[in-house]
Amino acid sequence: ALPISFRIEAIEQQSEVIKSFTLTPVDGKPVADFQPGQYLGVHVQDPDFANHEIRQYSLTHAPNGHHYRIAVKHEPQGTVSGWMHGKAKVGDVINLAAPAGDFFLQAAPSMPVTLISAGVGLTPMLSMLHGLAAEKHPAPVTWLHAAENGSLHAFANEVAETGAQLPHFHSYTWYRQPLDADAGRFNAQGTMDLSVVASELNEPDRQFYLCGPVGFMQFIARQLLDAGVPNQHIHYEVFGPHKVV
């Protein structure tokens, strides 16, 4: 299928380095459905680019039929992220390929779910959280996130508001190097240590979803496996070139 033209409807600064983009189809037709956790292919052409550029960005919300929202981290050398952060404006048109990806939420209503992320890796998790909230997921849902500090912690309020729609939700946040202004915004300093949720690690059917830098995911997967979580209950997504955790 050819990419479809979408108009940038809204741009919001979600952290010092992450902006979200709300995108609506130029033709006004309903948008293709997707599974929470999937991504869009974003096609960008600009006179400054040597080539037509394509990047994948995770959707950050539950399917709603009328628009998409993605979040983009500004990478220092990033051609497309630089364009999205520096040049893109409301009203601009970009082309999108249909949602795709084999990392998505698959949890029966009876299954507890833990969503684990670091940095911009929270984007597919946010979509999963919205998906669980839309279904009023009856089993417990836990949100674990690691950020550098409060200025780099995106979507904190949205996570709290969305989690509040679930019957059994709790979240825990680690800041590696908190700022003075961060008091009260995080639970622990340093790197993510799953011993704080030790009781969840031995639940027989709990599903764990991970997204973040490769080193982070290896670190978390090792903690999960050491705690006895079965390999088949650990689901992960690697941003960038795919490597095996």
Language-model segments: residues:
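Ferredoxin-reductase
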Residues: 1-92, 147-149, 160, 176-178
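Short, structured patches in soluble enzyme cores that scaffold and shape functional sites
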Residues: 25, 72-74, 98, 117, ...
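Short, conserved phosphate/pyrophosphate- and ester-handling motifs at nucleotide-, phospho-/glycolipid
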Residues: 37, 121, 213
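Short, glycine-rich nucleotide/cofactor-binding loops
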Residues: 112-123
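Reductase modules of NAD(P)H-dependent flavoproteins
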Residues: 141-245
